Amino acid sequence: MTYSELYSRYTRVWIPDPDEVWRSAELTKDYKDGDESLQLRLEDDTILDYPIDVQNNQVPFLRNPDILVGENDLTALSHLHEPAVLHNLKVRFLESNHIYTYCGIVLVAINPYEQLPIYGQDVIYAYSGQNMGDMDPHIFAVAEEAYKQMARDEKNQSIIVSGESGAGKTVSAKYAMRYFATVGGSASDTNIEEKVLASSPIMEAIGNAKTTRNDNSSRFGKYIEIGFDKKYHIIGANMRTYLLEKSRVVFQADDERNYHIFYQLCAAASLPEFKELALTCAEDFFYTAHGGNTTIEGVDDAEDFEKTRQALTLLGVRESHQISIFKIIASILHLGSVEIQAERDGDSCSISPQDEHLSNFCRLLGIEHSQMEHWLCHRKLVTTSETYVKTMSLQQVVNARNALAKHIYAQLFSWIVEHINKALQTSLKQHSFIGVLDIYGFETFEINSFEQFCINYANEKLQQQFNSHVFKLEQEEYMKEQIPWTLIDFYDNQPCIDLIEAKLGILDLLDEECKVPKGTDQNWAQKLYERHSNSQHFQKPRMSNTAFIVIHFADKVEYLSDGFLEKNRDTVYEEQINILKASKFPLVADLFRDDEDSVPATNTAKSRSSSKINVRSSRPLMKAPNKEHKKSVGYQFRTSLNLLMETLNATTPHYVRCIKPNDEKLPFHFDPKRAVQQLRACGVLETIRISAAGYPSRWTYHDFFNRYRVLMKKRELANTTDKKNICKSVLESLIKDPDKFQFGRTKIFFRAGQVAYLEKLRADKFREATIMIQKTVRGWLQRVKYRRLRAATLTLQRFCRGYLARRLTEHLRRTRAAIVFQKQYRMLKARRAYCRVRRAAVIIQSYTRGHVCTQKLPPVLTEHKATIIQKYARGWMARRHFQRQRDAAIVIQCAFRRLKARQALKALKIEARSAEHLKRLNVGMENKVVQLQRKIDDQNKEFKTLSEQLSAVTSTHAMEVEKLKKELARYQQNQEADPSLQLQEEVQSLRTELQKAHSERRVLEDAHNRENGELRKRVADLEHENALLKDEKEHLNHQILRQSKAESSQSSVEENLLIKKELEEERSRYQNLVKEYSQLEQRYENLRDEQQTPGHRKNPSNQSSLESDSNYPSISTSEIGDTEDALQQVEEIGIEKAAMDMTVFLKLQKRVRELEQERKKLQVQLEKEQQDSKKVQVEQQNNGLDVDQDADIAYNSLKRQELESENKKLKNDLNERWKAVADQAMQDNSTHSSPDSYSLLLNQLKLANEELEVRKEEVLILRTQIMNADQRRLSGKNMEPNINARTSWPNSEKHVDQEDAIEAYHGVCQTNSQTEDWGYLNEDGELGLAYQGLKQVARLLEAQLQAQNLKHEEEVEHLKAQVEAMKEEMDKQQQTFCQTLLLSPEAQVEFGVQQEISRLTNENLDFKELVEKLEKNEKKLKKQLKIYMKKVQDLEAAQALAQSDRRHHELTRQVTVQRKEKDFQGMLEYHKEDEALLIRNLVTDLKPQMLSGTVPCLPAYILYMCIRHADYTNDDLKVHSLLSSTINGIKKVLKKHNEDFEMTSFWLSNTCRLLHCLKQYSGDEGFMTQNTAKQNEHCLKNFDLTEYRQVLSDLSIQIYQQLIKIAEGLLQPMIVSAMLENESIQGLSGVRPTGYRKRSSSMVDGENSYCLEAIIRQMNFFHTVLCDQGLDPEIILQVFKQLFYMINAVTLNNLLLRKDACSWSTGMQLRYNISQLEEWLRGKNLQQSGAVQTMEPLIQAAQLLQLKKKTQEDAEAICSLCTSLSTQQIVKILNLYTPLNGFEERVTVSFIRTIQAQLQERSDPQQLLLDSKHMFPVLFPFNPSALTMDSIHIPACLNLEFLNEV
């Protein structure tokens, strides 16, 4: 392609920028051949003419299409160059917050300087087993790739982590080791993975320090080999260290610190155990205060020191050794603070003997003070003939002291590393290993010394190895695809390496100069200039004669030669070392022991003897100092580095390059300049260059065809089956240069930039099609607009014409209406005048006629009143006469009747004294007495009434007589006067009175009318106001009721949810304990299997521990408590079974019981909360009395049954004795002839029998009377309205009735015993008996009446108290109502709600008390019923025994009785020795296929029938042994078939059925509600197997968890492929370019690809097996709920970790797949299982991928819809969202920030991924069987002939 084709208008390019390194621009016009510049538009819309040089290829870099921006693999970019790489990393880091990016085989990790939630266990499990290219870049993906290649290729692996200080190397290496520790955890309980992780805090403490660039910088390199066995479990580890920066011990730059351990020890100096160290704060010591800053922000040195100590303890370092280590570290601090004083001559110096620090140094190391004081200031010179002791200058002494301190620390460092390696070693054979190399990256500072030189030398070696490995992989890919390839020219840094390590190279010359006695750094620098001045990688600075420049692969570095010789020699004087060797502390002496045969700290030959690579020590053996053969530091480092490279070359390397984004340690801040420097230094750009030199872009033929089919012509698409030839023909027509692409076996290979060119052609094609579509659409829109305008114009015309017509019509109507109005008005005016004249005439006539009538009225009125007066006077006189006569007659009648009554009473009293009357009235006498008494009372009352009436009449009569006399006298006086004058006066007075009355009447009428109107108006107002108040009151009441109902329902719902949640959590914790126990049990068995040897015998301690623990509790009613029984039990069970009885299980069992009790309490509480309070109130009001009545009736019936049973027993005994006496009499008559004694005894017995019958009748009579009285009292109580009084009476009544009945019974008995005293009254004594009975009855009735009166008085008082209480309550309510009226409406509602809540609370408390009382009464009655039932059974047994004895006495000869064959009772009998055979045939060797066509869960039924027979025979040991053997047998079967779904489901269903049988037939009433009478006969009689039910429940939980694990293992490989990758809807998924990861070794050819139908088929298999095995439907629902949760978790986790899966088409595919799974659930009737709810997060994620993501409304819709997704998950999906084509926009950063702002109030968990290992707690609901035990038949295929049916 020409430049004119590439650089056309709208093409975007990169140009250099001094601030941002690279800047984006866009061409404003096409480039033409010959142009010397490009016209560019920058991002700020400025126009720039950019000069170019086409001849020298100096043109700006092309920018990749937007669809490629943000790729997780840099090699997937079409244009591979520095600005593209930098921009892609910046976009991923800043916009998507992705810190990991692939660059071919390299993982680029950018330090975020912030804690991210992407390293948890859930993330580890998500990456485990996944291909490296399938998931988002992560350190876990690299670790998984290494682990997978180690297992697949059986080759050792290495992970090389590099980067400059502060880039995150140590953290990355730590997470890689954590991944291996989690995924490859040790199979045995050795905690080796914990020890590997525990080494990190130790090495950080002694090898890390604060620098200017990093607060936790590793100042040494380390290579950790993690060893694996053949099963790829971690068995051990080994560590090798490189180039510890010893100079930091004695010197630190400004704002830097020494190693962390020094400051940690100073922070803990106040602890009691460290008092002898004599330490103070770090500022007081020279070695720790040199940098100026002794603290790190956010770091607690004391806390870190405690972690270091814990890690040392975990790795087996004894406490004494730890103290010794801390003493050595403290001694180094004291040594650095020793004051050295120079003498006057300047050639010598001295140390004060009283120097405190030197004394502490010698004391802590256990050496001689004087010797160390001397040899610190002197040195020994040895010649061939003599030995000299020479003084040293101050500078020499300081250097010697510093060298000694560095040497001590280095030796201690090596000793600690050696000890860590010993702790991580194992005796098992190592099969392979994975090495993690955490080594310093390329470094360059203003002043670079020996350390930087060694570091950069190591990076040169690693870069060489890296380049060769990348080149090798690139060539392998070409050879695999069978395409021609040429040698790629890549940078080879071997010349630079030769400059450093070759003969007479820099290191060789340095060693030679060190051997010269007078060698100096300046001489060495001159030799370098002379020797290597012509080398292309060596330069001499212009302004310096002591520095030199080495051109490394990353950059030029200038080294200052000062200090090279001293650091390379690392001189320590022999005399000082000898003093340390003589230390009295073993550890100090051991550090400096000169033993050539000892294993150095980093020697790994023995620990890796089985490894494929024999790696020698990285640190050569230390020889005596100052010897000629002592190796220099440079030589040691070169040797160890060569060994490291040999190890790495023998392994498969994996690279992690850590990038430091900024120097200020700001979170998610990207500095392009610093990033580019590190990209150049770490080899990322070299990887890009190698990839760009070949064919970096690779497409499969299928993907290329789908992506670029728009560029193909119609004739080329005729045959779509041969896609390979179609792609070839298209490419040859589109790209003319055949060198730009190659056709491989399965892929098409493109040169750099070709994919971008194809994308440009594709975009141009779409642009042309878009223009055509726009043209057509615009024309159509214009036509539609014209038609709409024309139609609108016609409509306007039509409406205007219609409007004019309607206006004319309206005018005509108005004119006609005006005429009509005028006519009507004129008529109305004339009518009004006529009506006025007529009304005046009528008024005049009415007044005239009224005046005439007024004149005629007075005479008529006077005559009428006189007539009325006469009428009333005559009537009064007649009535008075009649009343006098009637009163006289009544008095006479009363006197006569009183006389007759007295005579009758006297006769009755005489008659009552006679005996005949008593005899006649012996029955019902008390009723007659009561009737007579009532009659007398009535007569007395009547007499009293009549007497009062008589006196009243007499007094009235006397008053009337006096009044009449007065009137008569007045009348006579009036008659004597003049009658005419009197009449005139009367008439005149009457007239005046009449006028006055008229006037008063008028006034009163007017006032009455006014008041009446006012009152009516006021009444109407009040009625209206009252109606309003009533309506408002009703409305408020309804509102209060609604609010109270809503609040109560809401509170009850919340409480129910809370209780359910607590119950689920408790159940989950319990089942996790069961799971942990099974894991501990498995570990115990594994350890036991490992430790067992052919000659092994248990020691006494083991034997006792095994025999003392018991896994299963005793089941008998009397527990086995002594040691002999326990030993016997162990012997019977067997050693293997007894070995399972562990102390851990007993503790867990105890915990299980406690949790079960808490669960029951919570369940009861939940059931109580779910009851409706109103229903409880109604039921208690309706049934409160019935309960007590039933209790009383039941009590009386039980008493009666007890008396009847005792009576029957006495009667039977009497009959038996009677017959026995008769038999004896017959024998006596045969021998003796004197029957008198027999007849006398017989008569006495007859008399006693008759007396017994009489007593029986009397008891019946009394019982009838008592029951009648009880009924009367109950009926009287039922008439009472109050509920509380009703519920409080029965208990007292029952007590009184019981006492009365007992007293009556004893009284009758006493009466019967005294009947002979009354025998003189008549011949048979019946009269006396009757009289005594009546007397007792009368006493009884009198007592009952007294009790009733007392009770009635109490009830009256109680009712009065209740009435008072009700009055007070009414007053309170009235006051409350008045107060409520004064409040505002809102306050009224709130006040009403509070009052209603308080009332409901009080009522609930009352009801709870009543319920508790009734429950106690019920329990008491149940206990009494059980006692009486037991007595009845005993009586029946005694009667049966007596009858059998009687039959035995009656039989006089032997009779042979034919027995029927007994029916099968549902029990199976077996002998003790057949138990092992039973378990083997029924459990161990049983196959589920053998029971096809039989009853489901047949083994469970058979086992229960065997248990039932053992219970029937009361054999405790047999039941215990059988259940223990069954449980152990099931465990063995499950362990053997731990991957067989069918076998596991078979035993899950049988274990649950056996558990249900033990519940159903346990005899507990709660489990017997659905049993038939026949099934109740099959209940256990002797044993309580409650604790065994708990053991079986735990076993069921374990089996369920194993079943879920098997099912998940079968489903998990299908989920990602079927749910995310397979195209369920064809044609939706687009195709994107793939990166290097998709073609790396992580991809395996021929990987299985699953579709959704595979998951559905697997689900159908699970469902069919579970149903065929007879598993409970409730458990089946829980199984599929768990499986659907796992599908949801795995799919969502992969979606959150895969950028290629977050697209619109994936959302469509997910919705379709989920709908298919929901349809399957409905088809299997599993929609109630809650499985759909578990898929809710995935459903919302699919909807999120399909929603619009632009505006504020879209953000609100997303927040309201995605309620099941956490904030982190929503943001992660939006960050990962990737458009599939160039026409769909990316999600902007501002939109994501808007989502975060709206979701910040959510309290979501800080967990990104779902826990795919989470398991819902399983619940086994009780499911009784309808089968009876006697209907079960055993098939012959089970070989159980030794079982006998009983």
From Swiss-Prot:
GO CC terms: actin cytoskeleton; apical cortex; brush border; cytoplasm; dendritic spine; glutamatergic synapse; membrane; myosin complex
Keyword list (alphabetical) reads:
Actin-binding, ATP-binding, Calmodulin-binding, Coiled coil, Cytoplasm, Motor protein, Myosin, Nucleotide-binding, Phosphoprotein, Protein transport, Repeat, Transport
State the source organism's domain of life.
Eukaryota
Compositional bias (Polar residues) spans?
Answer: 1100-1120
Q: Where is this region: Disordered?
A: 599-629, 1088-1122
Q: Where is this gene product found? A: Cytoplasm
Protein's GO biological process: actin filament organization; cellular response to glycine; dendritic spine morphogenesis; endosomal transport; modulation of chemical synaptic transmission; neurotransmitter receptor transport, endosome to plasma membrane; positive regulation of axon extension; positive regulation of dendrite morphogenesis
* Segments forming a coiled coil: 915-1272, 1334-1450
GO molecular function: any one?
Answer: actin filament binding
> Where are the compositionally biased (Low complexity) regions?
607-619
Q: Which residues carry this modification: Phosphoserine?
A: 1444
Q: What does this protein do?
A: May be involved in vesicular trafficking via its association with the CART complex. The CART complex is necessary for efficient transferrin receptor recycling but not for EGFR degradation. Required in a complex with RAB11A and RAB11FIP2 for the transport of NPC1L1 to the plasma membrane. Together with RAB11A participates in CFTR trafficking to the plasma membrane and TF (transferrin) recycling in nonpolarized cells. Together with RAB11A and RAB8A participates in epithelial cell polarization. Together with RAB25 regulates transcytosis.
How does it associate, per the subunit comment? Component of the CART complex, at least composed of ACTN4, HGS/HRS, MYO5B and TRIM3. Interacts with RAB11FIP2. Interacts with RAB11A and RAB8A. Found in a complex with CFTR and RAB11A. Interacts with NPC1L1. Interacts with LIMA1.
Give the UniProt family note: Belongs to the TRAFAC class myosin-kinesin ATPase superfamily. Myosin family.
UniProt name for this protein: Unconventional myosin-Vb
Query: Which species is the source of this protein?
Result: Rattus norvegicus
The gene designation is Myo5b
